Amino acid sequence: MLQVYLVRHGETQWNAERRIQGQSDSPLTAKGEQQAMQVATRAKELGITHIISSDLGRTRRTVEIIAQACGCDIIFDSRLRELNMGVLEKSHIDSLTEEEENWRRQLVNGTVDGRIPEGESMQELSDRVNAALESCRDLPQGSRPLLVSHGIALGCLVSTILGLPAWAERRLRLRNCSISRVDYQESLWLSSGWVVETAGDISHLDAPALDELQR
């Protein structure tokens, strides 16, 4: 059985400011750095053998801290990037016009083919993050990889493993530096393939983590 751990990046300046990030970037806050150190301690205990990360700046900084603790090399994979949120990136969430807010709500309320102008659909996001997960099956026997990505991206990944459409209503809370685990297995009582073991664990963090749409 292959166990794959999923981690969302640490808190960023724009998370704290309620700005929409998408594939734009802002640095980790001091709290985000602390979260990364705490998840790094947990990752070392888990015996992580490979670290695979989105190549955006906030995930890069998070995995630098994790890799120091685990002694693992880092593989950067652009398929693990956050949803491209088009013309809304960098916007303060409270400054959106009614039209812009309607675009944003499409990503939350389960709109088939919902898309922010110049951005991605949830199906496009799902296709690439699931492909990145499938690549873990090519790792050597006994590997225990850690994938570091983003809130909407990881939420979409876990939800589609559960059998939901990529564009389904967003009802899974994955806070900064939360840990989820998915397993690839053959089972008598579960559908063969990927299954969700845990989602959104924050027991390793010593302070509340933000839960904002901007990722």
UniProtKB/Swiss-Prot annotation:
The set of disulfide-linked cysteines is: none
Q: What is annotated as the active site?
A: H9, E82
Which EC number(s) does UniProt give?
A: 5.4.2.-
Q: In which pathway does it act?
A: Carbohydrate degradation; glycolysis; pyruvate from D-glyceraldehyde 3-phosphate: step 3/5
Q: Where does substrate bind?
A: 8-15, 21-22, 58, 60, 82-85, 104-105, 151-152
Q: Which PROSITE patterns match?
A: PG_MUTASE (PS00175)
**A molecular function GO annotation:** phosphatase activity
CC per GO annotation: cytoplasm
According to UniProt, the name of this protein is Probable phosphoglycerate mutase GpmB
Organism of provenance: Shigella dysenteriae serotype 1 (strain Sd197)
Q: Which gene encodes it?
A: gpmB
